[in-house]
């Protein structure tokens, strides 16, 4: 079984991927729905990171690498963290990661971007 097939089975087992008659916010009809809010455990987060890492690793080998992983707020934040950890653990690649805030803070770290800095020359993977 490929990691893609295993990932689909994992989403179904986790109650994240469901099948039926759904209508999206835009009014489009779809036979399936993905609700990532149904991931709720550390084991699921770890597995999710492993699936993302497998895909990213495969794609980056073909593309010649990357400099940074970016996870857009809000749902991309746990994805980028678990993917970066899994890439290091499973493949020995230690990517910097970064994510954004949707709102600026007036105390502490006031920036909108947190984590590794994004430089002009960086090749960035957006998760």
Segments and roles (model prediction):
Residues 1-63, 120:
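Active-site-facing substrate-recognition patch
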Residues 27, 69, 97:
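Conserved hydrophobic/aromatic pocket- or pore-lining residues that grip, position, or stack substrates
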Residues 81-125:
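Short, glycine/charge-rich flexible loops or terminal/linker lids adjacent to PRPP-binding catalytic cores
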Residues 44, 70-71, 106-110:
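Glycine-centered small-residue hotspots that permit tight backbone geometry or close packing
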Residues 62-75:
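Short glycine-rich phosphate-binding loop at a beta-alpha junction
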């Amino acid at each position: 079984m490929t990691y893609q097939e295993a990932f689909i089975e994992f989403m179904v087992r986790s109650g994240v991927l469901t099948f039926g008659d759904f209508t999206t916010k835009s009014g489009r009809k779809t036979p399936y729905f993905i609700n990532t809010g149904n991931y709720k455990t550390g084991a699921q987060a770890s597995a999710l990171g492993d699936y993302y890492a497998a895909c990213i690793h495969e794609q980056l080998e073909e593309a010649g690498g990357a400099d940074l992983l970016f996870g857009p707020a809000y749902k991309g934040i746990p994805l980028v963290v678990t993917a970066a950890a899994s890439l290091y653990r499973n493949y020995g690649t230690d990517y910097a990661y970064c994510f954004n805030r949707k709102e600026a803070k007036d105390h502490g770290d006031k920036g909108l971007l947190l984590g590794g800095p994004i430089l002009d020359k960086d090749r960035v993977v957006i998760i």
